[in-house]
Amino acid sequence: MNIEKIKKYTKTPIYYYKEINSTHVYGKQIEGQGDAILIAEAQTAGIGTKGRNWHTGENKNIAMTIIKHPNVKIEKLNGLTIEIAKKIKKIIKEMYDYNLEIKEPNDLMLNGKKISGILTESHTRGENVAFLLISIGFNVNETEFSEETKEIATSLKKEYKKEFNREEIIIKIIKNIEEIIEQL
C-alpha cells in the first residue's frame, strides 16, 4: 500500500501497520495523542458487529480507524454511522458504478452479502464529545473467506473478478469522513 500517496490528501497524521490486533482497540489507547488515522494491512482481532471478529486478509482489504476530537455536543453524532455508510455507498457508486445496500445499523452489503462494516464509538466529557473513533473494514480484494463467513461475506474482487485500488478508496473515504466531521 502506498501510504505516502494517501498522506497527500489529508492533514491528519497517518500511522501504518503491517499487522495489528485491531485499529479500533489501538485507537482507544492512543487517542490522547490527537487526531490520527490508523491503517493496517492485516488485523488479528478486528472488531465486527456485536463484538464478532472481523478478519482482514493481509494486503487485500481496508482496515482503518479515524480518531477525531470534534468538541461538539454528543447529540451532533446522532445518525453519524448511517451518514458514513451513505457516503461509502456513494463513493463506490461514483468510482465503479456498483450499488451497495445499507443494512442498518452499520453494514454495507453487495449482492446480499456483507462487504463492509462501520464501527463508531464516542467518549464524552460532560455533554461534549472528548474523542470519536470511526473504524471501517471493507473487503476489497479478499477472495478466501472462512467457513464461518463464506456464505455471508463478499468482496469487490470476489464479485467482479478483478483487482481494485485500495488507496483510491481509502483517500475518498478519508476525505468524505473529514468533511462530515468538519460539518458537525
Where are these regions (language model features)?
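Short loop/edge segments at beta-strand edges and connector loops
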Residues: 18, 102-104
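Long, positively charged amphipathic alpha-helical accessory segments at protein N-termini or as interdomain linkers
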Residues: 9, 72-100, 110-184
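N-terminal lobe of the biotin/lipoate ligase/transferase fold
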Residues: 1-95, 164
